[in-house]
Amino acid sequence: MASDVDTADGETVILNCIDSDGSKLDGDHEEIVISTAEVSQWDLTSLSHRPIIKIKANRQRQIIFSAHSAVFVLSRTIEWKFQASLFFGVDKLLLVCQSWLEYVTSEVSIWPPQLCLEDLVHIWDYGRENAIDFIPQLTGYLARNFIWMASCDSFHNVPFELLLSCVKQPCLTVDSEKHLCDAILLWLAANTNPSDRLSSTGDARPEILTEIRTSLLSLPFAAGKRRCPFFSKFAERSVVAICSLAASRTFILADILGGGDCNQLRIHLTEYTKILDLSGCPQINLPLLLLNMLPSSNNLDKLLMKKLNQLSLKLEHHMDISRISWETFPVLTFEAVQVVDVSNCPMLHLEAAIEFFSKSFPSLTTLKAAYILTFKTMKLYQLLQRCPLLSDIDLTVDSTPVIPAKVSVISSFPAVMLQISTSPNDEIRPDVPAFHFSRQLSNITKLILEGRTDFYDSDLQNIAECCPSLCCINLNACTSITDSGISILVLKCVELHSIFACDTSFGHNCVLSLCRNISRLDAVAMKMADNTNSLAYKLQILHIGGCKGINETSLLELISQTQRIRSLCLRETQLVDNCLYKFSGSSLEMLDVSDTKVSCHAVGHVVRGNPLLKCLIARGCRHLLQEENDILGNSPVLYYELGKSCNLEEISLGWGFSFFSLEALRPAIKMLRTFIVGLGGSLGKDGLKLVPTFCPWLETLILYFQVVSDSVVRNILETLKNLQVLALCYCFGEISSLIFQSSAPRLRKLKLERVSTQMTNDDLLILSRNCMNLTELSLVGCKRLNSESQDTISNGWPGLISLHLEDCGEVTAQGVTSLMNCQALEDLLLRHNGLGIDRNFIIRAASRMPLLRKVAVDVCDAKDGDFDLPDFPDRNFLHIVKIARCNLKRRTLGSTKSGTCTTPVHAETLILTWDSRKLSRTVVKERL
């Protein structure tokens, strides 16, 4: 805001306050004249919307005049010093402004963006300079809104003293300790000279790191920060503490705290907390969570500590939680909490935690509890009863690799039932209803059960009866439910508009239910011309990829009625051109027709009528290749239509996709984020060189069977500054060590499969320095690597959550040693990397890596010829174990009798999958 002083007469002066950005203000644009004699009558809210304000003041009131400081009305700046306020009689104005500041910072409902962070910093500077006592209010306000403050572009300009003061506030409110740590590290990185990052001597700023409760960080985050210059020691201690807590079978406070207080285990949970994010914390168990819901004190009384320890022992021995007296714990209530995320918390007894969520979080609407296998789906009704306001639940687990339509089963073994409860009331038979008989209607609108093989038709029927408001259901890879079970849900939940049912038994009965007129339940409804009352007509999302039970006729009937659909996945179905020609919707944003028999013309027909299309997935469609010569201006009709009408964010193509197709697509891919080219596509080196130019905002680039070279890959890494995922799989043209010298600090996922056979340990070391933030790494066919590469991987990428090594020389010839230091791993595949893996490797890995859910190995690498299989107690967090076995095939060398050699040929794969009820063992032909 600019200001100047005009002389009106001998006794009065006028201060003109002009907003430099007044064009952006709403409201009356006329100037207004006010007087300092009427400060008490000023309407600050109204004044804040005026582009020009004229303030009249009596000259006789001047005592001292100077310039250059700051006072604020809302977020509008007037340049003057504190002493100059007396000239205009603004001492009263200061009181008004201070009163306003007290009001606005005390209002929980005020949304922070109404206040500019830069202005708040100026207010803080002004108050500190002039010893005004509103600083505590201001720091408290920023502490309560710390997440907003950290998200502001000017966060790095916040003075250290102000930041430290905010972090030390008891009311500091953050979603998780990870968010606090990340914000502090970002601030330090922006305010620390590179030469000072390796040493904290002479700098008081690293003291702020001691305010981080490192024992409460998520394991992947803490492990990944072990390479952070000024946080490496803290991160190392954090990982040790987390793994120690996760390994403790019992929660004994005295042992954990060593006689100290509980502050380091106190989650930042305040009366202002809206989101509680504990995801990825294997150290979080029920007693530790309960500790944070009890009244805060430096030391718990002995009786309460004893109760916590007893609770831990009861849960360890799988005691029926209905026998536990929860009322003995005086938990606090946090009214503001609406979202709780405990995904990837394997030690948390979710069933028992629900008891406390219902008491401490009465406003809870969203619960994310993905990858918690111990939660039995039969307890879902208990969750709905205890937390009646819940509207969104996520119980996702990893999808089983044993999808009936995708594998050839050689043999299967009787399921081993998991008996962990001492309660005679806990039924584990799949045919027993999972809910109590006393129905209570739930407010659930969104339910995610992806991958839950312990979910049956009876469970689905009870959901249909108890959740009439259900709008979105995710049943992807729920292989235990049937077509009839899903159809009953569809019939009863008439509010459904989003269905995810990929790789299930979704079939003809479901189609009948969707296409039936919801106001008429007779057979005539299917034949009526007006289908606007059918559920299919109202669908917004329908994902049924991989569902082989839908024939062409049913699919045509279904698609012809989905006129309002926004997202449609039909991959690996019996989809043909006629079905797409029947599609009359115009709101489509995502279409997946991969591995179907559709043609360019049919897909082009859909594209032409849906200009809002942002995502097209059409890999594996061989019929797209047949129309390669059907071109308009050297481009197939499909790509011509895409380039003419769409602004794509994701595209996945294969057969028939060429350099000319890329040229035709150019207008549509300027803002592309994900680009996948699969088998049958042929961009060539020239086409790949154009990708960074055509798609400068790419974040994901995945190439299968493409021709690549050093220059192509280096151009991609050096030009695409936002690239986070790069996969080069089975590509033609060897890439050398030159590409590993390109820096890609934003890269998070890297796959090099059969493209870098000459990679050495030194190359891997260079790669770890230039792509230091990887969280997922897959190397296949790097035959020159040896056991030393384990050190490079564990030291270079300590925060890895996924590691796949296959046909990589002698990496495991001396056993698996250093890789055990990748303690945040969730997915580990080691195959054909050298004979040397110990028999007990799977059990040992599960005990050392608290978050490990998936393991894949090959008997060829087993030092003793086999692997021990974990029992229920030994599996820890394991969900899927795949053990491949090869046969040695004799291969004759030439026509001589000088000798023969053998080569391993895949024979079968043993798959073990655990869920909340049982262990399933299956042998399949495929190498999974």
Regions from the language model: what does each represent?
Residues L15-S46, I252-L269, S322, V331-L332, ...:
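Intrinsically disordered, low-complexity PEST-like regions enriched in Ser/Thr and acidic residues
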Residues E79-W80, G89-K92, L101, T105, ...:
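Eukaryotic basic, amphipathic alpha-helical target segments in cytosolic regions
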